From Swiss-Prot:
EC number: 3.5.4.2
Keywords, in A-Z order: Hydrolase, Manganese
Species whose genome carries this gene: Bradyrhizobium sp. (strain ORS 278)
Name this polypeptide is given: Adenine deaminase 1
Name of the top EC class for this enzyme: hydrolase
Gene name tied to this protein: ade1
Signal peptide stretch: none
Similarity remark: Belongs to the metallo-dependent hydrolases superfamily. Adenine deaminase family.
Residues passing through the membrane, by range: none
Annotated catalysed reactions: adenine + H2O + H(+) = hypoxanthine + NH4(+)
């Protein structure tokens, strides 16, 4: 049998194709078949043993590694030889938990951004696009790879589809859907972060059966069930979380919380915000085995990646905190690959794996000179050298803001009871984790309850993007939004259901901003003093844009510049990363997962006004 015939293309991972690929790699490793390319490097890091070897050679066949060893000792024929004697080779970096949607780039352009920064494979935590178009989720994530993009994307369908039983539209996943996803592709690694903790522990929660159905379907396929344990810091809850089979947490905030979760078997995915303190503490604690720790960028935007880097930046932060560079590299490579059960394909410079290599000019500073992916060079410095597939995303990806009417100022009015000069109002703040809302007495004018600038109280709204009717829920929020008259900000990124949110000093400005978003199929819209001052286009899913990161960043910088001309209300909260100025993080203030209690969602059957306690299902009027 001539195995050289009909060797499958190796873009996707398929069991039948994998056998043929491996058969060819065996003969190539033995020197019985010619290899495509050999890369000779000054030294090479074996992440399995955390040891360096000098003057090594990596031999590629197709997109895979066929052989690794001392330079000059490979016995077979090589079509092309490349010499990099001054550089150190480490495996391509992996994102253990990332929402590519938060880069606001489509996958093909995400690849062009992150590959030069070492990121060659990503476990896509897919509950953003899946909440917009759940039926097309895997198709969306695989399309760029099928067209030749070097970035390997391993999707995890979202457990939070919908995030709670009180949210609707765009997608719905249960056990049957997850079982189908796990069967569809070996590149589906499991279930995206389980966030609705009340639905895990409480059998009376309306999402209990749906969520456990998805967990069970993932177990049945030996997939990984990712966790989200924000706010769970007491030992009973941590033990219960681990007992549920939720394998990880990327929400740790303190060293003690990290230790308690690590020692109960959770895989820890560290974000940069708490990394210096946590890593320094773990080093002082004498942690010997770092194999249960990885680094994650989670929701990093394209603008921040251009400024800081991708997961390479996280590793530099860890190294600056005292972690050995070799351990930091393991946290980007073999550790996430083991956790996601992907070691046959990624995570190390070893035969059978994809030919993903990061070439470092300075290991201690993690300075990246080149990146190779799929056995070929794809970047030099931060310049991407590869081709970007030109994808004309179809209507199912680009026509997702379904509002078939003009939104009007009166949609945001909160009518007062007849004859009243004041009304009581329920008020919350961004990242309001308190078990109760605030109550304020607000003035009535022209039959409607009014904002109160003197108390930093403005109006916040959610506009349904799915039904076609543009249903609106609205209430008063404190410590956010514009003081500038006739000013509003609206955005179609509203984690995790991704309806449209708007905050404004007037109802008319809010309507104008929302209508601008509908016209461009999502993104940002800023109305300042009655005029549309800036927009940013997220035309794919209302979450992403199909263009270069630099072009998107230029539009974002223009938005920020216009935003600096607005007087924004601000009050600090106990939630980290809520800053004065342009309130970009309101995108995340609409979350409904633990530890949130009282939230505003789009109008639903259980909460016609949209104001509901997601821990208990209790509702309350927004004014009375």
């Amino acid at each position: 049998m001539d195995l050289a015939q009909d060797i499958a293309d190796d873009l996707m991972i398929d069991a039948a194709q994998e056998v043929r690929i491996r058969q060819d790699l065996v003969l190539t490793a033995l020197g019985h078949r010619p290899a495509d390319r050999a890369l000779r490097v000054g030294r090479l890091l074996d992440v399995h043993s955390r040891t360096w070897s000098e003057d090594q050679e990596i031999v590629f066949k197709g997109r895979r590694i066929a052989w690794v060893g001392p330079a000059g000792s490979y016995r077979g024929e090589v079509r092309e030889r490349v010499q990099r004697p001054d550089l150190a080779a480490v495996p391509g970096f992996g994102e253990v938990h990332k929402h590519i949607e938060s880069s606001h780039l489509t996958p093909e352009w995400e690849a062009a951004l992150v590959l030069p920064r070492g990121n060659t494979w990503t476990c896509e935590a897919s509950h953003e696009f899946s909440n917009v178009n759940g039926a097309r989720n895997l198709e969306f994530w695989f399309e760029a790879r099928r067209r030749g993009s070097p970035l390997k994307i391993f999707p995890q369908p979202g457990s939070a589809v919908p995030p709670t039983a009180y949210e609707w539209g765009g997608g719905w996943y249960g056990g049957a859907e997850q079982a189908s996803f796990m069967r569809e592709s070996l590149m589906v690694t499991g279930l995206d972060e389980v966030m609705d903790w009340p639905a895990v522990w409480n059998p009376d929660n309306p999402s209990y059966e749906r969520l456990w159905g998805m967990i069970g379907a993932t177990f049945a396929a030996r997939g990984v069930v990712e966790g989200h344990a924000s706010g769970l810091r007491e030992l009973p809850e941590i033990n219960a979380f681990a007992a549920a089979g939720l394998a990880s947490d990327h929400e740790v905030q303190t060293p003690e919380e990290t230790w308690d979760k690590l020692t109960r078997g959770l895989f820890i995915e560290l974000r940069i915000y708490a990394m210096p303190e946590i890593i320094g503490w773990l080093l002082k604690k004498g942690l010997q085995d770092w194999s249960q720790i990885a680094f994650t960028t989670d929701d990093r935007s394209a603008s921040h990646t251009l400024a800081l880097g991708a997961s390479d930046h996280n590793a530099r932060v860890a190294i600056e905190a005292g972690l050995a560079p070799e351990i930091a590299i393991q946290c980007l490579t073999i550790n996430p690959a083991r956790h996601m059960r992907l070691t046959p394909f990624v995570g190390s410079l070893a035969p059978g794996r994809f030919g993903d290599v990061v070439l470092l000019s300075d290991v201690g500073k993690l300075e990246i000179a080149e990146v190779w992916a799929d056995g070929a060079q794809v970047s030099e410095g931060t310049r991407y050298l590869g081709d970007v597939p030109r994808i004309a995303w179809p209507d199912w990806a680009t026509q997702t803001i379904n509002i078939k009417r003009e939104i009007k100022a009166e949609d945001f009015a909160l009518p007062a009871a007849p004859g009243r000069t004041t009304m009581q109002a329920a008020v919350i703040r961004p990242f309001h984790w308190h078990p109760e809302f605030y109550t304020f007495e607000l003035a009535v004018r022209d039959g409607a309850v009014q904002r109160d600038e003197s108390q930093a109280i403005t109006k916040f709204a959610i506009v349904d993007r799915f039904s076609g009717d543009g249903l609106v829920s609205k209430m008063f929020w404190k410590g956010c939004g514009p003081r500038t008259p006739e000013t509003a900000l609206a955005c179609s990124v509203a984690h995790d259901k991704h309806n449209i949110w708007a905050v404004g000093s007037s109802d008319a400005a809010m309507a104008k901003a929302v209508n601008a978003l509908v016209a461009q199929q999502g993104g940002w819209a800023l109305v300042r003093e009655g005029e549309l001052a800036a927009t940013v286009r997220f035309e794919v899913g209302g979450l992403m844009s199909c263009r270069r990161a630099e072009a998107l960043d230029a539009e974002m910088q223009a938005l920020y510049a216009e935003g600096r001309k607005v007087d924004w209300m601000y009050e600090p909260t106990f939630r980290p990363r809520w800053y004065p100025g342009f309130p970009e993080r309101l995108m995340f203030a609409t979350l409904t997962c633990a530890p949130w209690s009282w939230v505003l969602v789009a109008p639903c059957e259980q909460a016609p006004q949209g104001f509901i306690n997601v821990q208990t299902g209790k509702t309350h009027p927004v004014v009375w």
